[in-house]
Curated annotation (Swiss-Prot):
<feature type="active site">
    <location>
        <position position="54"/>
    </location>
</feature>
<keyword id="KW-0441">Lipid A biosynthesis</keyword>
<protein>
    <recommendedName>
        <fullName>3-hydroxyacyl-[acyl-carrier-protein] dehydratase FabZ</fullName>
        <ecNumber>4.2.1.59</ecNumber>
    </recommendedName>
</protein>
<dbReference type="InterPro" id="IPR013114">
    <property type="entry name" value="FabA_FabZ"/>
</dbReference>
<keyword id="KW-0443">Lipid metabolism</keyword>
<dbReference type="InterPro" id="IPR029069">
    <property type="entry name" value="HotDog_dom_sf"/>
</dbReference>
<dbReference type="GO" id="GO:0005737">
    <property type="term" value="C:cytoplasm"/>
</dbReference>
<dbReference type="GO" id="GO:0006633">
    <property type="term" value="P:fatty acid biosynthetic process"/>
</dbReference>
<dbReference type="GO" id="GO:0016020">
    <property type="term" value="C:membrane"/>
</dbReference>
<dbReference type="GO" id="GO:0019171">
    <property type="term" value="F:(3R)-hydroxyacyl-[acyl-carrier-protein] dehydratase activity"/>
</dbReference>
<comment type="function">
    <text>Involved in unsaturated fatty acids biosynthesis. Catalyzes the dehydration of short chain beta-hydroxyacyl-ACPs and long chain saturated and unsaturated beta-hydroxyacyl-ACPs.</text>
</comment>
<dbReference type="InterPro" id="IPR010084">
    <property type="entry name" value="FabZ"/>
</dbReference>
<keyword id="KW-0444">Lipid biosynthesis</keyword>
<keyword id="KW-0963">Cytoplasm</keyword>
<comment type="similarity">
    <text>Belongs to the thioester dehydratase family. FabZ subfamily.</text>
</comment>
<keyword id="KW-0456">Lyase</keyword>
<dbReference type="Pfam" id="PF07977">
    <property type="entry name" value="FabA"/>
</dbReference>
């Protein structure tokens, strides 16, 4: 039995995530399975505002933005798995553990984001995340995200 790939285009992503330019860091979802995993891409362009200061002579995509891109991917997986937050709820990044940066990411690279759902306990979800460029891991981390009323 084969399973059809599930994808999301940018319009569908914007319907789920509250982030907008310059902070929307997921361009396309290439595959996902509810309550299991999500794969997405982030195209890194020299035209992004962070490159004016990080670093002008040798532009490098900030590691914290790689982690944020992975967190946004976890949000997409959570929303497709358990439903989008209510109007009085917020889904936010709660913690990062075991973050490792292995190679710099530069303009022209395409980040492949892979997040895996591990468990949910009292509204706090645990995920493993990996970011790759050309098949090589550039970043990995454990991410926790929380869904809370405000």
């Amino acid at each position: 039995m084969t399973r059809e790939n599930k994808t999301l285009n940018i319009t569908e992503i914007q319907e789920l995530l509250p982030h907008r330019y310059p902070f929307l860091l997921v361009d396309r979802v290439t595959d996902f399975e509810e309550e299991k995993y999500l794969h997405a891409i982030k195209n890194v362009s020299v035209n992004e505002p962070q490159f004016t200061g990080h670093f002008p002579q040798m532009p490098i995509f900030p590691g914290v933005l790689i982690l944020e891109a992975m967190a946004q991917a976890t949000g997409l997986l959570a929303f497709k798995s358990f439903g989008a937050p209510a109007e009085n709820e917020l889904y936010y990044f709660a913690s990062i553990d075991k973050a490792k940066f292995r190679k710099p990411v530069v303009p022209g690279d395409q980040l492949v984001l892979e997040v895996e759902f591990i468990k949910d306990r009292r509204g706090i979800a645990l995920f493993n995340g990996v970011a790759k460029v050309d098949g090589e891991v550039v970043c990995s981390a454990e991410l926790k995200c929380a869904r809370r009323e405000f």
